[in-house]
Amino acid sequence: MHTLDGIICYLSKEDMELDPKAFDRVMYSFYRFKEEGIRLHLTILAYRLYSERKHADEVFADRSPHKIGFMFLNEFECERFRFGAEKLLNTVNPYTKMRLADDPMLLSVELYNEMEVGADFVFSFYHWNKNPRFAPLQEKIGEAWKSFLKRRNLPLRPVPKRIESGGRNSPDETLFLEFCSEQLDRSYRWGEKVLRDLGWKGAIVQNSQSKRIVYGSSRWRCSNTVEAHGYFAHPSRFTGKGSQNYQRSSVEGLAEQFRSINSVRQYGRAFQTGEFNHAFWNRWIHEGGIVYPALAAFQGHQAIAYFASPYNMRHSGISCFEIAENPVMAANGFLGAVLFGRGDIRPAKHQGVLNIPNSYLKQGTNAYFPINSEQSKIALMT
């Protein structure tokens, strides 16, 4: 459950000031989840960072720089994180009579939704950001890069301007990937401490969207639980005018959506899918209730969650993601609950494991790319 940072303060008069009515509705929703036996995956920061409505759209528009800000432990983003974690985890729920941090209903906590999307743009943000509000963050990145090089007894050099495939990559670009991965470690450890100090003892996840191996190395060092997000036939511009998506079957592509998500799974670690769906505009949408849930059950994943709302009070047309407005997606949700949740498909007895040596990550910009599509097919084996 995320975007709470765009709900509980939105109608208040100040940023980081609770709207009592909205916060009560959130507390009641937690209670109802518990009554229905639903486990909760909670995201602390997502898009609006507990801003009131006059500032919320501006914060949303700057979502990538704000992710970078949290990555480099910028005070603006860290303060918003501390606020959200304190209110959501440490408040005694008037309906359940306990803190969420102590409630077995809470399955896992994500620090910042799809954090590494910001990490993808660190080098371009550093060189081309023109917003004066983020100038101090640019300076912070430059100082962190210098410190990183000094710790390795390396000569100072500029932040790279690009990272790409092919023979034009320099050793500096490979080094910069290590730098970004290290910064993700630092932000994870900082957020982890905040949550542990509040008494949360369960799973903490981060870097849930990108399939780049470099982010997997950070997950491996930091967390015993891995989460991933992904969509089949994700529209090119979401639901905006001119958006396009492809019209092939997910079965035809040998379940590439599942294989892509499963490729970030790590041996011996709990694995969950915090967001997945089969987009509305793809004519094979009815496959969304069978292909992904069945394979996730077959491979023994711990949890899966459709994106997004199973119920919506808005009177709007069918969208690409909202289950509430789409009867086919609603049916897919039921089938997913049967195949995965009820256990109609049992996990395979064997798994294929792909070993990625550290030497591979040091070669060129290998770390910048995901697992090869052919290699990801081990997810279909048993």
Predicted ranges, named:
Residues 1-193, 197-223:
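Active-site mouth of glycoside hydrolases
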Residues 121-125, 235, 286:
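Single-residue recognition of alpha-helix boundary sites
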Residues 33, 38, 184-203, 211-233, ...:
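Catalytic-core region of carbohydrate-active enzymes that cleave or remodel glycosidic bonds
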Residues 235-241:
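Short, charged, surface-exposed secondary-structure boundary motifs
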